[in-house]
C-alpha cells in the first residue's frame, strides 16, 4: 500500500477530528504535514513502523517520517521502541542504547590496514558476506606513549572536532590497558543555546572526550605460555545488579535526536566508581558495583590441538583475537554467567564479526573489540 493510498483510506474514515480539520482548511493554501490530526498521524506512523519497520534498508522510511517536522518526530519517538525491546537500530542514538535482552545484534567490522581505520556494519542477513549498513567508524592514532582510537558516526570525518564524534579509546604504552571515553560532557559542562540556530553549543572550557565509561585490561603473559588472551572489562556506567535483576540500564533519551550537536549521540549515565581496572576495586560503598565482563573459558580440543569456543557459525578463522565475554557474578570467587554479552571473531583477512546484547551498547561493544586489534607481545 502506497503512502498516498494510506492517507486516502485514513481520510475516508468517519472521524470527527478529521472532518473538523477538513472543514476549516483552506483549499487554496498548500497542505502542511504538521497540521495532520494527532490521531490520524499516530495511525499512519504505526502502520509505517509495522509495514516498513523491519530491518534496513526498509527501516529508512521510519527515519524519514521522523524528519518531516517536530510533531512527526515526537510521535515517532513514542512509537519506535528502544533496541533493548525491539532488537532494531533505528536512529543514531540507538548506538548508545543497550542491546536486546534475548538475542544478539549481529554486526561485522572491516579493517583497512592502509588507513588504520575500522568500520562497523550492521548485518542485514545471516550471511557473512552481505554489505551491511554502516554504523560507526574508528581511526587509529599512534602517539609516543599511547594509542588513541577515535570513534565517529561518519567514515569521512573522524575527528574530535566533528559533530559526528562519539568518543575515543586510549591505551597505555604496553597496549595492555585501555580506557573508553564518552564524547558527552560531564555534569560540570556548560550548555549554551545559539541565538541564530537551535543547535546546543558546549563551552570550550570543558574538553570533550574526558568522560570514562569503561576500562579494559589484558592479563600479562610473563611466562611465555601459548593460549588465548585473557581480558577483563569494567563497565563504569552499568551496575552489576542490572544483569542480576534484569533491570533497565539508564541510557540516552531519544527526545533530542533532531539536532546534530545536541546530546543525541551522547549517553548521560554517571560512573559508579573511580578509575580502576581491577576486579577487586570494582566494588564501592556508595552504590552498586559496576558490571565486570570476562572471557568465557575455552576448552582444549585434543584432535584439533587448539583452544575452542562455540561461536555458532559466526567465526570461521582461528585467532587469538577471538573472544566471548560474559558477566562476572562473583569477582572474589571468579564465577561467571553462561549468557554471552559480546562475542568477536575473525572470518577473513580483514573481516571480523561482532555480536552484542544487553546490557552494553553498540558503541561500547565496538570500543571493546577495537582493543583486540592492538598488538601486545606481552599478552600473546
Curated annotation (Swiss-Prot):
Tell me the segments the record calls region Disordered.
258-283
Q: Any one Gene Ontology biological process term?
A: response to fungus
UniProt GO MF annotations: transcription cis-regulatory region binding
Triggers of expression: During imbibition of seeds.
Its GO CC terms are: plasma membrane
List the PROSITE patterns. TUB_1
The record's Pfam families line, in alphabetical order, gives: F-box, Tub
Give the UniProt keywords, A-Z.
Abscisic acid signaling pathway, Ubl conjugation pathway
Which portions of the chain have biased composition (kind: Polar residues)?
272-283
Highest taxon of source: Eukaryota
Q: Kindly tell me the pathway this chain contributes to.
A: Protein modification; protein ubiquitination
Tissue expression, as annotated, is:
Ubiquitous.
| Occurrences of domain F-box (ranges) | 30-76
What's this protein's family per the entry? Belongs to the TUB family.
* Subunit (UniProt): Part of a SCF (SKP1-cullin-F-box) protein ligase complex. Interacts with SKP1A/ASK1 and XERICO.
UniProt name for this protein: Tubby-like F-box protein 9
Organism, scientific name: Arabidopsis thaliana
Q: Provide the gene name from the record.
A: TULP9
